[in-house]
């Protein structure tokens, strides 16, 4: 079994940097991108080769404020206008607010995204000796996600929670072939990172909870734990 892929992507953009004049409170970027993807797959006779070529052209922009200490934000979006990219789009944004709480620094981060994209090429086409599929009728995956994050610097605490909705989720079924779920799938998640330090001893901890609305299509462990205990010290000065 063999397959090959060659991809070339070019992006042309123009940017107005944040602060280029006194009225520019944020940076602004516009761009256009073209991606050419060439795939070679074996045919059913295992001798000849099937060739696939896909073009994607997107236009998009970004609005971002990165300067300053209190408030930062970024929003970026792109939409497909030619060939395989038609009907596809991606929009994502994030915002972080930093403020003092007593003698500590607290950061609140909010993230959101929405996208409508084709499943990966090898989910749509794959040829081998034991598995062979051409799924030309697959629908685009529509995803929306919201996430919030809280960081407390002095306590070395990070708390994160998010929710995601996926329509036409693409997965491998029990026959190890790609399939799309009809309707929507929801995923809830929350995680806590808490680090401790006592002299040269360090203990990093992460607890993650997650829940899928369809465990058959997207099985997820309810709880996962990570712990890392180590010592950190200097062997020599000025080294």
Q: Would you name each region that the model predicts?
A:
Residues 1-239:
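Exposed, low-structure sequence patches enriched in small/polar residues
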């Amino acid at each position: 079994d063999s397959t090959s892929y060659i991809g070339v992507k070019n992006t042309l953009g123009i940017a107005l940097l944040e602060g280029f004049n006194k009225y520019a409170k944020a940076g602004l970027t516009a761009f256009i991108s073209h991606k050419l993807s060439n795939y070679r797959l074996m045919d059913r006779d295992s001798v000849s080769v099937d060739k696939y070529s896909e073009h994607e052209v997107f236009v998009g922009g970004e609005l971002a404020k990165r300067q300053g200490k209190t408030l930062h934000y970024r929003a970026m979006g792109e939409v497909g206008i030619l060939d395989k990219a038609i009907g596809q789009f991606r929009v994502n944004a994030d915002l972080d607010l930093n403020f003092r709480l007593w003698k500590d620094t607290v950061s609140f981060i909010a993230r959101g995204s929405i996208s409508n994209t084709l499943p990966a090429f090898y989910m749509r086409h794959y040829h081998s000796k034991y598995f062979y599929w051409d799924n030309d009728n697959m629908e685009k995956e529509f995803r929306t996600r919201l996430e919030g994050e809280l960081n407390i610097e002095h306590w070395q605490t990070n708390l994160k929670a998010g929710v995601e909705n996926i329509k036409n989720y693409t997965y491998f079924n029990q026959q190890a072939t790609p399939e799309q779920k009809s309707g929507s799938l929801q995923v809830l998640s929350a995680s806590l990172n808490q680090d401790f330090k006592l002299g040269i001893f360090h203990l990093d901890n992460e607890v993650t909870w997650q829940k899928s609305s369809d465990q058959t299509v997207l099985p997820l462990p309810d709880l996962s734990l990570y712990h890392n205990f180590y010592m950190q010290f200097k062997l020599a000065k000025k080294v």
